[in-house]
C-alpha cells in the first residue's frame, strides 16, 4: 500500500513538473513582468483612490495616469491570451463557471469588508449591481458568452473553419462587428435606467479592448516587435496627462468605463458634448499607447538593468505577473482596513507638509508591493482558477 501511495505521489509530482515546464515554454518573460507591473498599478491605484482629491496633486495625477491604461491593458491581454491558448473540450464551461463563481465570491468577500470597515448595514450584498472591483469578473463572463457563436462553429468543424483564411476573415468580421456595436450602445439612453446593472456599462465600454486583444492574437502581432511609434505617443500622452491633469480632468470620466451620458454631462467642450462617442473611440488608442509606453519601459529595464536590486525587482515583477488573479481578488480588504484605521487622513485634509505627503506616497508604494508579495500564493491561485475541477 505504501509503495502504491509513493508511486502515486511520484506520478503526481512528475505530472505537475511537466505542466509547469510546458507552461514555462509558452510564457513570455517581458509580458509576465508587464502583468506584474499592471497588477501593482491596480493595487497602488486602489490605495490612491481615497486620496485622489487630496490637496497634494501628485496623488490624483498618479491615480488618473494609472486609470488611463491599467484595465484596458488587462482586458487586451485577456483577449490576446484567450485567442492564443489551445482550448480543450469543456474549457468554455469551466471559464464561465469560474468567472461567475469568482464574481459571487468577491461580492460576498468585499461586502464583509464593507460591513467591517465602512459600516455597511445591509446583511446581503446586491448581486445585480456592480461598479466596484468585482466588475472585472462579470465583464469577462459576458465577454466569454459573446464568443459562443465562434466556439460553436469551431467545435462543429464547419466548412468555414476548415480553411484558415476563411476562419481568420470570419473571426475578424465578427469581433469587429462587436466592437462597432458596443461603442454606440455604451451611449444608449437605456444607461439612465440600468446604471451599473450587472456592470453592463463596463462590459460595453471595455469590451473593445478584449476583442482587439483577440484580433492581435490571431494576427502577426508580436510583443517582441511592438513598433516604436505607439510607445513614443504613449509617453507623450502619459506625461501630458500627468502634467496637465487640471485642464483635461473633465475628460477623465471616460477612464472609468461609464455610460455615455455621464461623459456628456461633464464640463467638456460643446463639440465633444455633441459627439462624445469620439472620446470613447479616441480613448482606445490613447490608453493602449500609454500601455505600450510602460511595456517598453519594462522591457528596457529587463534588458539593461544590472545589479542585485535590478535583478530582484525583475524577478519580483515576473513572479507577480503569474499571480495576477489572486492578487486582484483578495487585495482590496487590506486597503479598506488600512484607511479604516485612520491612515492618510492628514493627506486628504492637507494637514501635513509636502515632505510628509511624499513620505506617505512612498509608504503606499511599499505597502502595495508588500501586498503583492503576500498574496502571490499557489494556494490562492489554484482557488481562483478552480483547478480542482480538472484541466
Identify what each model region corresponds to:
Residues 2-391:
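Alpha-helical transmembrane segments and their immediate juxtamembrane cytosolic regions
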